[in-house]
């Protein structure tokens, strides 16, 4: 056979043959390095899908129920949403393996709707992180941490004080309601507006009156965004729908455009009034950071001016909805468990007193309150799933094959209710996070609670959210006692959306004495 081929290729020397063989081997080794073989593994199990629509028909709002098929199929479940394969991950160790040990295999998915969030420049939703931060390690430094770390302590204290100020409004409102014709009121509205005001102060350096139309417009816009995103967008999974009339998608695009216009206006104002020696808020801090890096060509962290708008927008959205939802659930749990409410008040009375407002430095002295917050996060799991991820390459996890571009959902609800992690997970019990004598917080147990994701793509607003929830809740428990309205049952059934919220309701609040 070789002799038959030789006339076709001509005479070949031994050295040329060796060079050719070495070249072929090097190319083969390079291809193996760039495209390593994924160990042969079966696809993840899952329910039978229908053509085109997949498994969407079996879920409310087009989203998988957080407590659904996992018990039947295990920690790795494959489903079909429209025409796209989706893997749902459950189990603490499985999720830890995926997000931390194999975190480089995942990124935000290239979903159609994501390009309209922050004009495609969102830190949380963009598939291209290179334009925000250059190297992978620096790529996930939280801008809020940057704000704190750069020495802008006066501005930080100002906004911590703002949380105290806004937290104190609800007790005053309760006092007004108590002397009115109707002793009940909707605490959710006051919580949302107060939280929005603190976030505005931290991000934009401005605060509003609670009836200010610009503030209320922002609150309503954020509420609309949550409802639209929570209802799902099938155009992300059935491409044909992108070319058909879609009222939900039009509404989604309009909401994002209004957000961008608002933030762009504020960022422009900040550039015009920027003073390097007077950093007022996170926007100023990011501008300062951007200006410094422009002068340093060798900097590890690079950020364009236009990215500032997207980052500030992300921080506002992440901090606002998470905090307001956490606080509203907290009030509901206080009403549902009056004995815990009294226990929390007694701890604050003993450790902080009633003559001043609690501050962040009180946290280490209030382990019962910290445990209560952990249990709120765990039991309500109001963020049942993280922001979707996507496989960057063919990979395998726990013996199952996950093809490149597979969308990956992380089931936080299951982790927070896993009977292998938690004793009686359906029971609300803050003591699970305390030492036997309730004098210390069990930090190891707290680390198992999953609400803000895990690994390099943790929620960028986590630090802001935790601090605000602590301050607001400490002030409310110190100054108020919450009660259900007689004759009206307390309905804590969650309503699914971007975050799971309880049904709006009226409660009663009594102002506590300062003695």
Swiss-Prot record:
Cofactor(s) this protein cannot do without: heme
E.C. code: 1.14.14.1
Induction line: By benzo[a]pyrene (B[A]P) and beta-naphthoflavone (beta-NF).
Cellular localization per UniProt: Endoplasmic reticulum membrane; Microsome membrane
GO annotation, cellular component aspect: endoplasmic reticulum membrane
Alphabetized UniProt keyword annotations: Endoplasmic reticulum, Heme, Iron, Membrane, Metal-binding, Microsome, Monooxygenase, Oxidoreductase
Similarity comment text for this entry: Belongs to the cytochrome P450 family.
Protein name according to UniProt: Cytochrome P450 1A1
């Amino acid at each position: 056979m070789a002799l038959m081929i030789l006339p076709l290729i001509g005479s070949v020397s031994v050295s040329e043959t060796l060079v050719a063989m070495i070249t072929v081997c090097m190319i083969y080794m390079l291809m193996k390095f760039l495209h390593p073989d994924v160990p042969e593994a079966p696809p993840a199990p899952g329910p039978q899908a229908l053509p085109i629509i997949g498994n969407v028909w079996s879920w409310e709002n087009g989203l998988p129920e957080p407590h659904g098929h996992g018990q039947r199929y295990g920690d790795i479940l494959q489903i079909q949403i429209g025409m796209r394969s989706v893997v749902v991950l459950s189990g603490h160790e499985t999720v830890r393996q995926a997000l931390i040990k194999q975190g480089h295999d995942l990124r935000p998915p290239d979903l159609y709707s994501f390009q309209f969030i922050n004009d495609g420049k969102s830190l949380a939703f963009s598939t291209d992180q290179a334009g925000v931060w250059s190297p992978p390690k620096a790529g996930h430094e939280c801008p809020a941490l940057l704000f704190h770390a750069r020495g802008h302590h006066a501005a930080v204290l100002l906004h911590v004080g703002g949380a105290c100020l806004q937290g104190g409004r609800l007790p005053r409102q309760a006092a007004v309601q108590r002397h009115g014709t109707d002793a009940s009121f909707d605490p959710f509205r006051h919580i949302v507006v107060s939280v929005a005001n603190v976030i505005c102060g931290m991000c934009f350096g401005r605060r509003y009156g609670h009836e200010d139309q610009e503030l209320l417009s922002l609150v309503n816009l954020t509420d609309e965004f949550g409802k639209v995103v929570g209802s799902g967008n099938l155009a992300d999974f059935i491409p044909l729908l992108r070319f058909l009339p879609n009222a939900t998608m039009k509404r989604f695009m309009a909401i994002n455009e209004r957000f961008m216009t608002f933030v762009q206006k504020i960022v422009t104002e900040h550039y015009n009034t920027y003073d390097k020696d007077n950093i007022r808020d996170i926007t100023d801090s990011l501008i300062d950071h951007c200006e410094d890096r422009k002068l340093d060509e060798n900097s590890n962290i690079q950020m364009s001016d236009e990215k500032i708008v997207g980052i500030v927008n992300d921080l506002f959205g992440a901090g606002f909805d998470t905090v307001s939802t956490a606080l509203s659930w907290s009030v509901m749990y206080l009403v549902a468990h009056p004995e815990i409410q009294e226990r929390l008040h007694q701890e604050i009375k003993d450790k902080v007193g009633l003559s001043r407002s609690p501050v962040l430095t009180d946290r280490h002295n209030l382990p019962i309150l910290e445990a209560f917050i952990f249990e709120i996060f765990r039991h309500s799991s109001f963020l049942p799933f993280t922001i979707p991820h996507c496989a960057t390459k063919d990979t395998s996890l726990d013996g199952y094959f996950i093809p490149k571009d597979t969308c990956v959902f992380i089931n936080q609800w299951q982790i927070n209710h896993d009977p292998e992690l938690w004793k009686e997970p359906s029971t609300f019990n803050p003591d699970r996070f305390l030492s036997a004598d309730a004098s210390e917080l069990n930090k190891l147990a707290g680390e198992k609670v999953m609400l803000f994701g895990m690994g390099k793509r943790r929620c960028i607003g986590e630090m802001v959210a935790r601090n605000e929830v602590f301050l607001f809740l400490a002030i409310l428990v110190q100054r108020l006692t919450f009660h259900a309205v007689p004759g009206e049952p307390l309905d804590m059934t969650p309503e699914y959306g971007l975050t799971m919220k309880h049904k709006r309701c009226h409660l009663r609040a009594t102002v506590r004495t300062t003695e």
